[in-house]
């Protein structure tokens, strides 16, 4: 009897233990299901950190450039394709390269239509000057025709020089906007770099980039554009007379200006890339050492602190890359629209020279061709400067990626 009672008690205890296991298993399954459902409906911790960092950053200095671009040129893009700055930054609403190209193409046609008046004026004045030039050889008393030809020729020269000055003004305005934009976006990128532990890179790049941007911009204003302007003027003066030519001096000034531009771009990119990469390597080694020491020698919370720091650094990296990519888009658009204006003017003058050439060989045609070629050089200078800032911004984006790879 005693043995039977013990056996029943054991069976009852086993049954109760089995029920408890089933209850525990049911609770674990319910907890796992609830956790999965909440995970599917809520955002991940990394996304929350990214959104929080983006909202706490002072993006107003950069955002005003995007707002100004949309105010000035947003009409060339479909309204549904122009997101706000924060939508572009967080990726909730983007802008495709297709819509950008469509907007730029619309702007090209708009500029061609606007400059059609300039084309018509140049063609009419050129035809009128050729008629007066023909009258000079048809009559013995050609004083009036010579005077009319000279006045017409001077009017064309004034129009050409004025167009060239306007093009240089477009280029200077674009370069000034890009310099100010680079100065505005640097604190954002450097702050995120510092939050990722890239203290050495920030200490090196902050004064270096500010100094190089201002130095290169000032040098282009003081040397490159004035030399291109004087080169164009000397070419025009050389077309006035067959006896007195200064084309060699004009070509020399043009060569010097383009050579100086190449030197500025090379020095700027070389210094920033070398110093930035060296700083990124040092930061990567330092952060990796600190992470190893924290994770292995700090008891209990060391590994947890190391993983949390890694999550924050990864979120900062994503935010920095997003800001960098938005900055690249803004930088391209700051350069693209003035560059289109300059290219349109160059196209107008080259087209005028091509249309007028079958009517006869005239100094005016050579003058128009010279202005068109000089405008192409102004565009090349603007494109080189924008490429320099574009690569500098890309280097800034890549620096933290190098330090993360080192970790």
Name each model feature, range by range.
Residues 2-28, 32-125, 130-149, 163-173, ...:
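Gly/Ser-rich, low-complexity
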Residues 146-157, 178-186, 215-221, 252-266, ...:
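Small-residue-enriched core segments of transmembrane alpha-helices in multipass membrane transport
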Residues 150-163, 182-199, 219-231, 236:
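Mid-bilayer segments of alpha-helical transmembrane spans in multi-pass integral membrane proteins
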Residues 181-185, 192, 354-358, 362:
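Extended, low-complexity, charged alpha-helical tracts
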Residues 205-330, 334:
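Generic multipass alpha-helical transmembrane bundles of integral membrane proteins
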Residues 321-362, 370:
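Helical hairpin unit composed of two closely spaced alpha helices linked by a short loop
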Residues 341-349, 353-357, 361, 376, ...:
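Membrane-helix cytosolic exit motif
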């Amino acid at each position: 009897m005693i043995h039977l009672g013990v056996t029943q008690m054991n069976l009852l205890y086993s049954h109760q233990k089995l029920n408890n296991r089933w209850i525990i298993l049911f609770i674990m399954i319910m907890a796992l299901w609830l956790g999965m459902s909440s995970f599917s409906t809520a955002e991940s911790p990394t996304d929350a950190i990214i959104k929080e960092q983006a909202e706490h950053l002072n993006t107003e200095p950069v955002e005003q450039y995007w707002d100004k671009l949309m105010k000035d040129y947003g009409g060339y893009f479909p309204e549904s394709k122009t997101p706000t700055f924060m939508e572009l930054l967080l990726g909730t609403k983007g802008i495709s390269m297709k819509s950008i190209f469509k907007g730029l193409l619309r702007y090209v046609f708009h500029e061609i239509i606007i400059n059609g008046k300039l084309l018509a004026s140049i063609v009419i004045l050129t035809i009128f000057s050729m008629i007066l030039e023909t009258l000079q050889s048809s009559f013995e008393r050609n004083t009036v025709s010579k005077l009319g030809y000279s006045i017409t020729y001077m009017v064309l020269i004034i129009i050409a020089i004025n167009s060239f000055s306007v093009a240089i003004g477009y280029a200077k305005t674009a370069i000034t906007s890009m310099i100010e934009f680079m100065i505005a976006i640097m604190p954002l990128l450097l702050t995120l770099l510092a939050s990722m532990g890239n203290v050495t890179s920030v200490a090196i790049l902050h004064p270096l980039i500010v100094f190089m941007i201002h130095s290169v911009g000032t040098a282009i204003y003081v040397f490159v554009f004035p030399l291109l302007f004087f080169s164009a003027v000397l070419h025009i003066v050389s077309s006035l007379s067959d006896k007195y030519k200064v084309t060699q001096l004009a070509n020399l000034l043009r060569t010097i200006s383009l050579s100086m531009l190449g030197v500025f771009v090379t020095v700027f990119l070389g210094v920033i890339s070398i110093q930035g990469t060296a700083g990124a390597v040092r930061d990567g080694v330092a952060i990796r050492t600190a992470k190893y020491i924290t994770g292995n020698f700090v008891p209990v919370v060391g590994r947890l602190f190391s993983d949390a720091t890694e999550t924050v650094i990864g979120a900062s990296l994503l935010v920095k890359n997003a800001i960098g990519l938005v900055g690249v888009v803004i930088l391209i658009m700051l350069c693209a629209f003035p560059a289109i204006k300059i290219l349109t003017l160059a196209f107008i003058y080259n087209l005028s020279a091509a249309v007028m050439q079958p009517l006869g060989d005239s100094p005016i045609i050579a003058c128009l061709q010279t202005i068109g070629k000089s405008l192409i050089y102004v565009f090349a200078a603007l494109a080189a400067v924008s490429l320099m800032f574009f690569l500098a911004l890309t280097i800034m984006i890549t620096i933290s990626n190098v330090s993360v790879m080192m970790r």
